[in-house]
Amino acid sequence: MRILIVGAGEVGSYVAARLSREGNDVVVVDESRDPLTKIERENDILTVVGDATNPSTLHEAEVEKAEVLVAVTQSYKTNLLVCLQARQARGEEPLSTIARI
């Protein structure tokens, strides 16, 4: 399963590592390169540096291939906006979304 995780903090890093170990194809998006470097070094996970509320960042992260989006930034507003943007980008294609609020 392809899972897109937005937010590479403590929660996002843990969820990404766990899901990757279970055999899922995981992509993590964060505005900061530092936590993404650690995730890449410790796991077989693709990362994207950028603002996930920007549709071009979601496109770069290949949101159209994701089956699930998990938004776990520190901002509930950002998490909700990312979920809405991702669903909008997918059009009629179903996408399960989980937002930390």
Q: Language model features by range: what are they?
A:
Residues 1-101:
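Cytosolic regulatory regions of ion transport systems
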